């Protein structure tokens, strides 16, 4: 259980001391420095003007800062098309000494002058060693003053149930996630143009690391998301694309009512602190508003190194529609600095 936290690890096997009138358990733990700040810079060229565009984000993660196991995450993104988003969350594990986690999330999206959306959610999770089982409530509101087609005001409320199985690899400082399986389902109602309709969402996420040898490691993930509702509008669709999903595309540039994504990194470790990797991502997504059923893919290469104060990662990737020839013109260069403190 200790090794599945991200702020402590065992440095020696636990010991038990039996006496005539008591039993003592001795744990030998080491606190891990897991507070982090990510700075991300992305360069690409405009196909029409040839100008270089700059995008970026700031991501702060605070873990066990107050020695209660809490996790505070803050992720802000700003893109060249005036698309801004803020994803934040606070998690209190083993709340008030109970086996339950308490989580609150706030997500904000501003899509230029088209619309603004805000999503609030509260979840309670039961810890069962490596398994978490949760229930939660989610509220989403979206507003628009524009007269753009397929964008409308709406609000929705969902009741969510979820289950997660997670195994960490505390010995791997660069790729610490060994296995993760998440299943989440939400059901509720949506009010749009004074009409109430049913709304259902589900998400499946599987991440697995394969250690072929001390030098070769494959990190693969499969993600599937779907939203079901009548009279879908653009501002309620799932958004994906970018460095945290299918690379080689702009962040959150793809709008879909459902998608399936396979992302792979084949990593070759030059030593304990440096590795190079290949990128191959493949996805299918549907957009019933635009009657799209599209296959896309991306490929590229990357490099990561562990320094005394954090991790530096650089990757070069290009996204394309399936069936189109692959070339590296207008590919994206991502530079990520993760500082631990």
Stretches found by the model and what they are:
Residues 1-182, 210, 239-242, 252-256, ...:
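Gram-negative/organellar outer-membrane beta-barrel architecture
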Residues 284-288, 322:
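Short, solvent-exposed loop/turn segments at secondary-structure junctions
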Residues 44-49, 160-270, 278-279, 286:
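C-terminal outer-membrane beta-barrel translocator/porin domains of Gram-negative envelope proteins
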Residues 17, 304-306:
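Well-ordered beta-strand positions
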Residues 263-265, 298-304:
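Short glycine-rich, acidic/polar surface loops and turns
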Residues 131, 214-216, 272-274, 310:
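Secondary-structure transition into beta-strands, especially the periplasmic turns and strand N-termini
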Residues 281-284, 309:
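C-terminal beta-signal and adjacent terminal beta-strands/loops
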């Amino acid at each position: 259980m200790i090794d599945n936290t991200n702020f402590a690890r065992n440095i020696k096997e636990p010991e038990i001391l039996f006496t005539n009138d008591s039993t003592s358990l001795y744990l030998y733990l080491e606190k891990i420095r897991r507070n982090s700040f990510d700075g991300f810079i992305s360069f690409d060229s405009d196909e029409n003007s040839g100008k270089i565009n700059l995008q970026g984000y700031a991501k702060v993660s605070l873990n066990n800062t107050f020695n209660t196991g809490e996790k505070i995450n803050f992720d802000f993104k700003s893109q060249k098309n005036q698309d801004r988003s803020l994803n934040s969350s606070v998690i209190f594990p083993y709340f008030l000494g109970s086996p339950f986690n308490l989580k609150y999330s706030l997500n904000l999206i501003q899509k230029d002058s088209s619309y603004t959306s805000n999503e609030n959610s509260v979840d309670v999770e039961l810890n069962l060693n490596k398994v978490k089982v949760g229930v939660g409530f989610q509220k989403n509101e979206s507003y628009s003053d524009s007269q753009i087609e397929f964008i409308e005001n709406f609000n929705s409320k969902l009741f969510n149930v979820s289950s997660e199985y997670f195994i960490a690899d505390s010995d791997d400082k660069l790729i610490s996630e060994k296995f993760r399986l998440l299943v989440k389902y939400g059901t509720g109602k949506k009010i749009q143009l004074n009409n109430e309709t049913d709304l259902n969402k589900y998400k499946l996420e599987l991440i697995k690391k394969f250690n072929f040898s001390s030098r070769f490691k494959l990190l693969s993930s499969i993600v599937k998301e779907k939203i079901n509702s009548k009279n879908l509008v653009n501002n309620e669709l799932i958004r994906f694309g970018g460095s945290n999903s299918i690379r080689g595309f702009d962040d959150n540039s793809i709008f879909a009512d459902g998608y399936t994504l396979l992302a792979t990194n084949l990593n070759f470790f030059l030593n304990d602190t440096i590795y190079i990797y290949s990128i191959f991502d493949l996805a299918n997504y549907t957009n019933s508003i635009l009657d799209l059923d599209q296959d896309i893919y991306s490929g590229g290469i990357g490099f990561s190194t562990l320094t005394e104060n954090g991790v530096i990662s650089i990757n070069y990737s290009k996204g394309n529609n399936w069936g189109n020839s692959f070339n590296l013109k207008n590919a994206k260069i991502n530079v990520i600095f993760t500082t631990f403190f």
